[in-house]
Amino acid sequence: EPDFIKPHFGLRLFPVWHIGTDYLHEIGKNWYTHLTDNGVEFMWNTKVTDIDFIYKFINFSSKNPKFNSVSSYDRLMFGVGKSGIDFGKQLAEKYDLPTESKPVQIGVRFEAPQHHFQKLIDISYDFKLYKKFDNVSLRSFCTNNNAAFVAVEDTYGNHSYNGHAKKDMTYRNDMTNFGILMEIKGIDKPFDWSREAVKKLQIAGTGTYYSPSDRIPSQTSEGNFVRCVVVENMEPLHDALGIENANYIVDFIKDMT
């Protein structure tokens, strides 16, 4: 265990295999083929509009005339994800379904030259750093090394920032990026709170970028600069999360330096 993490973090060792973003497409295709070959039917361009949990019917609208607008079911696995959480809340209220609030999970993506983390990478490619307080815990996740890039994705009408790493070393840039995820307990309506926090973090739907050393935003694997708004200080983070919560993230980063 590298000496520099002992005062601040816990290190847990798990087996890790790096697939690479460039090879993940093939795994997705194989997974899809396996399911369809075994009788699973995917309904694309289809939106569920209502679920009757009493009589076991699903209503949906589809651009594909092959599918009916109503279908019955014997068993239902209901998973809406974050994009469908409002729909899930509507159904829970309509049918008086029991729900449980979960802690808020929100964070930032951090990027730095890889040599700063090489001791950890030599132990585990996707190393995990943890730090815990009374009602808040922080952890690193989704670590990318060697040929590591930040990519912008459109999520709910705003930009979100994801890390990618290619297996093909012709793309090598010797950078490391990972998310710093903060879990906050005791917040009423956690998804609404986090959605508002993201809006405050962004400017015109685009994420903000801050570098204390005035580094320019990184490039994507296609050679384009990552779309973002460069800011001069941490005020957007303070405004979005509150000074106390923002300082937890700042302290997490300082403990790595």
Feature annotation, model-predicted:
Residues 1-257:
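Residues forming the flavin
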